[in-house]
């Protein structure tokens, strides 16, 4: 009875992982060997704020879930922590910022963006892109520039007329 209950729990876990992996736009797999629980919890807390899921998953269960999603080409060995979410840039920034702080114990191993395998170099390049909020700020600045220059020009014209 105990084994059957454990098996049912694993089947439910794989089904849950499959649905989450299937809906995620980005998934990164990192080696966390030697990382303390406290530091892993700090990563989870940072991720939670950004809507990113962080979970240590048994490799065999993760492999089954990945296979069902159509991403079976990943070689899952050693100790892995899985991070996934909908924002590729935020996820990449989170992983590389955390990796800078803990380079001896936290290393990006593999990544999937829109269920396509991507290299570590690609993920690093994405991590250097501006975030969605930064891009919106840049765009807003570009849109408001003509009005800002027009108002500045009118103000300069008013000052010039006052001096004369």
Swiss-Prot record:
Statement: the UniProt record of this protein carries the keyword Metal-binding: no
GO biological process annotation, one example: translation
Keywords for the protein's UniProt record, in alphabetical order: Ribonucleoprotein, Ribosomal protein, RNA-binding, rRNA-binding
A Pfam family it matches: Ribosomal_L10
Keyword Ion transport listed: no
Origin superkingdom: Bacteria
GO molecular function: large ribosomal subunit rRNA binding; structural constituent of ribosome
A cellular component annotation (GO) from this entry: large ribosomal subunit
Job of this protein: Forms part of the ribosomal stalk, playing a central role in the interaction of the ribosome with GTP-bound translation factors.
Subunit structure: Part of the ribosomal stalk of the 50S ribosomal subunit. The N-terminus interacts with L11 and the large rRNA to form the base of the stalk. The C-terminus forms an elongated spine to which L12 dimers bind in a sequential fashion forming a multimeric L10(L12)X complex.
The family this protein is said to belong to: Belongs to the universal ribosomal protein uL10 family.
HAMAP family hit by this protein: Ribosomal_uL10 (MF_00362)
Protein name as catalogued: Large ribosomal subunit protein uL10
Organism encoding this protein: Helicobacter pylori (strain J99 / ATCC 700824) (Campylobacter pylori J99)
Gene from which the chain derives: rplJ
